[in-house]
Amino acid sequence: MNIRILGLAVILAVNSFAAMAQNSDVAKKEAIAVKEIVESRNFKINILNVLREKRVYMDIYSKNTIEIADGKLIAKFPYFYRNDNPSNTAQSYLKIDSDIRTMKIKNKAKRGMYDVSIKIDKPSKYVVNIDIGYDGNCMVYVTNSQKKTVIYGGRLIEPNM
């Protein structure tokens, strides 16, 4: 009886190690793909949720994207501070279609993410910072001149999607 239990434990341990190795291989491949996309400086982020200053968290599952391509930032940020009590989301959008003045990318390996800092030409009153995890999850921080920040959560996607 003890031999059967020991045999079962060995089989479970071997299967567990194989599954963990397979998961780490998938994570490594995903991290390499994210690195290539970020370093190309051409990528899109699909916005999935928003967290405003009052810590109101909303899942929006929008079709809105933040696109960085060819030295431009094109974005439509829902639920921004243009109207705090909109009757519909279109009343509170912030649209940006501007050339990028500066774009800095830092690899923060200890945190498992890239930090992308963007300053745009017009409107110059906004600063956009993006944290892109090695797994493709993103946090986008948009700050206006009154220091109000809206945080968007999303997912990195390839630019041609």
Task: For each feature predicted by the language model, list its residue ranges.
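Bacterial Sec-dependent N-terminal signal peptides
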Residues: M1-K28
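N-terminal secretory signal peptides
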Residues: N23-P86
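Mature extracytoplasmic domains of secretory-pathway proteins
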Residues: I66-G112
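A generic structural signal for short, non-catalytic loop/turn and secondary-structure boundary residues
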Residues: G7, V14, V38-S40, G133
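Short, low-complexity, polar/charged sequence segments that are solvent-exposed and flexible
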Residues: S62-I68, Y93-K95, Y134-M139, P159-M161
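A short linear-motif detector with a strong N-terminal bias
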Residues: Q22-D25, K44-N46, R52-R55, Y81-N83, ...
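Helix-rich interaction surfaces within compact, conserved domain-sized segments
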Residues: T102-M161
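Residues that act as N-cap/strand-start positions at coil-to-secondary-structure junctions
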Residues: E30, M58-I60, D99, G112, ...
